[in-house]
Swiss-Prot record:
Keywords: ATP-binding, Cytoplasm, Kinase, Nucleotide biosynthesis, Nucleotide-binding, Transferase. CDD domains: ADK. ATP binds at G10, A11, G12, K13, G14, T15, R123, T132, Y133, K200. Catalyzes the reversible transfer of the terminal phosphate group between ATP and AMP. Plays an important role in cellular energy homeostasis and in adenine nucleotide metabolism. PROSITE patterns: ADENYLATE_KINASE. The gene is adk. Residues 30-59 are annotated as: NMP. Consists of three domains, a large central CORE domain and two small peripheral domains, NMPbind and LID, which undergo movements during catalysis. The LID domain closes over the site of phosphoryl transfer upon ATP binding. Assembling and dissambling the active center during each catalytic cycle provides an effective means to prevent ATP hydrolysis. Residues 122-159 are annotated as: LID. This is Adenylate kinase. It comes from Aliivibrio fischeri (strain ATCC 700601 / ES114) (Vibrio fischeri). The keyword ATP-binding applies. AMP binds at T31, R36, Q57, L58, V59, G85, F86, P87, R88, Q92, R156, R167. NCBIfam families: adk (TIGR01351), PRK00279.1-1 (NF001379), PRK00279.1-2 (NF001380), PRK00279.1-3 (NF001381). Belongs to the adenylate kinase family.
Amino acid sequence: MRIILLGAPGAGKGTQAQFIMDKYGIPQISTGDMLRAAIKAGTELGKQAKSVIDAGQLVSDEIILGLVKERIAQEDCAKGFLLDGFPRTIPQADGLKENGVSIDYVLEFDVADEVIVERMSGRRAHLPSGRTYHVVYNPPKEEGKDDETGEPLVIREDDKPETVLARLGIYHEQTAPLIAYYNKEAEAGNTKYLKFDGTKLVAEVSAEIEKALA
């Protein structure tokens, strides 16, 4: 089962990725993790990536695709894998196809921007411990204070509405073409495209995924 996940930051993708990994026993492949592992292991591709990163440049699609191919050839991917954060562009999606990497399912988690802004901007964090709260969904016992220490909670830079909106803008710009691409692929019978309502309860979405992948 080879799966690609699409969804804006804050759409609940990470939670469902964990559910799929546990349920089907397949690993999640993140390009960031792969890059770090290849650099640490000093593989040929790792060395190439390191020299590019050290020069302050972006790692090419060619190197990333090489890493993906190496990674999915490993034993733990025998039953399949979950790609998150890749492909991000049409050339990357084409690259996967040209390298003979077939995808069984593309799962999109759809949540309106205003809902994501509300979700993210309601987050509060206690930085020293890493504990997180939400003013609506998981409020602290006392407003604005950490449950255990009573220290003040903060809004992380990443959760501020303007930051969230900027990230969403980039996401839509990058991902809208991919959504169209994989819908076309599904029409051609090359993959199955499934769209889920990310505003539903986590357990509901998980149940829908399980049913769709059965």
